Amino acid sequence: MSSKIMEYTKDLSIVISLYNEEESLSELVNWIEQVMIREGYNYEVLMVDDGSTDGSWSLVKKLSEKNSAIRGISFRRNYGKSAALYHGFAAAEGRVVVTMDADLQDSPDEIPEMYRMVVEEGWDIVSGWKKKRFDNKFTKNIPSKLYNATARWITGIKLHDMNCGLKAYRNDVVKNIEVYGEMHRYIPYLAKNAGFGRITEKAVQHQKRKYGVSKFGLERFVNGFLDLISLWFLSRFGKKPMHFFGFTGILMFLTGAVLTMWVIIEKLIQQAQGLLFRPVTDQPLFYLALVAVILGFQLFLAGFICEMVSRNSSERNNYKIREEF
């Protein structure tokens, strides 16, 4: 997303990614509306339907007829939360952009204080921290603590709950980052890499799930760790892959060359001393050296190819939208 100066037509944009949340939508919208009226905000609610197969999208359209602040985007199929946030961020017109989940586990009552922290205290991002959780201890709470500890160590961002869906951003933060793949978990890290380093957190009330079942499982946490490693690598070497592949390749190549020279010199010394010696091709060290040289050359070539790809990649998200209003 490109940076551009814009006039904010709203105080708040609330971006909600939803997938098969028909049961909770009416209650959530009513709750948000009560808070917005009480605080006197000029607001909009951007509901992004990520390919729901229930009646979620039809309900969003009905709710928008009663409340003109509701806007909707519907994908043709399920692309994931990152895709929903990407389009929600692009459409957001509010001075402050708030993200929250549609399952009623995030409380709209937290929004006013988070808004104040962004506007009055000047934070780029205020991230929610579910200090007291109502999730299964073994399948979600413990993996979550392990995941967040690792995320803090790798990213250097001291957040207790990196993956909390309830967050508040300055508008120019979301306009200057690209959320893709499964990187919605690491928006604070994306923002930090884009130059938005004023990041803090606020303890928020976590609600018990009222309808349906959680769509998060142990597999999502494993994927989260893999995504974190990918993001760390891309943030360090994404624009300069030759620095990683080239350096590693040269190191391997030189190691192989040194081992090869050692085998040859050893043979020459034994010859000069009239000692019996095995043919070079009978020595395991020779093949180890050969493998190192070949791997080094291939890694260097991979770095060159990645460098060319990174220089010519458009890095655009391309998702098919069925309907938008």
Where are these regions (language model features)?
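N-proximal low-complexity "stem/linker" segments adjacent to membrane-targeting elements
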Residues: 1-34, 41
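Hydrophobic helical membrane-anchoring modules
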Residues: 2-9, 188-325
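Donor nucleotide-sugar binding loop of glycosyltransferases
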Residues: 21-24, 52, 81, 107, ...
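Residue-level preference for short helical/loop micro-motifs built around acidic side chains
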Residues: 23-27, 54-58, 83, 161
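Short beta-strand/loop segment that forms part of the nucleotide-sugar
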Residues: 29, 33, 41-52, 73-74
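A conserved acidic beta->alpha catalytic loop
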Residues: 49-58, 104-105
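Acceptor/aglycone-binding surface of glycosyltransferases and processive sugar-polymer synthases
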Residues: 62, 69-77, 81-91, 96, ...
